[in-house]
Amino acid sequence: IGGETAEHPGLMPVDEYDVAGFAVGVVDRKDLITGENIKPGDTLIGIASSGVHSNGFSLVRSVFTITEESLNTYYDSLGKTLGEALLAPTKIYVKTMKSIKNAGVRVKGCSHITGGGFYENIPRMLPDGVRAVVKKDSYEVPPIFKMLQTDGEIEEDMMYNTFNMGIGLVLAVA
């Protein structure tokens, strides 16, 4: 089991604590998704995220001045307040994965797009010698990421290396 300890520089006083939770699942060995059978020519399917999820907030805080007023400011481009866009709950993909399995789709690999964005997470599911080609123009990047990129003058590569850019889960299928 892997994991990390979240750091909140400049956000939390030394004497405060961050409370987090986790879940552990059980799967039959025959249903394990290992990525070992991914081959060139397989298809990658991106499943939408619900927003920023919980990654890249140090960069978010460097782009936006976070105050009660700024978080409560409504933006037409977002269709909501900045706070609502940034704090949208992280999507959990259990129901999505169950539906895909029940539809008979053979998932060969699965990559949760977290810290490290596309560039670090997608390769983790690929066997040696296999690489992914992501067609960035095949979906619409959500407005919160466009706003972050524009307001922060952030290069596209940095955006895809930090954020999920609207794709929270990538599946490799035959």
Residue ranges and their predicted role:
Residues I1-S58:
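Glycine-rich anion-binding loops of enzyme active sites
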Residues M12-V19, S70-L71, D76-L87, K91-A174:
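Glycine-/charge-enriched secondary-structure boundary and capping motifs
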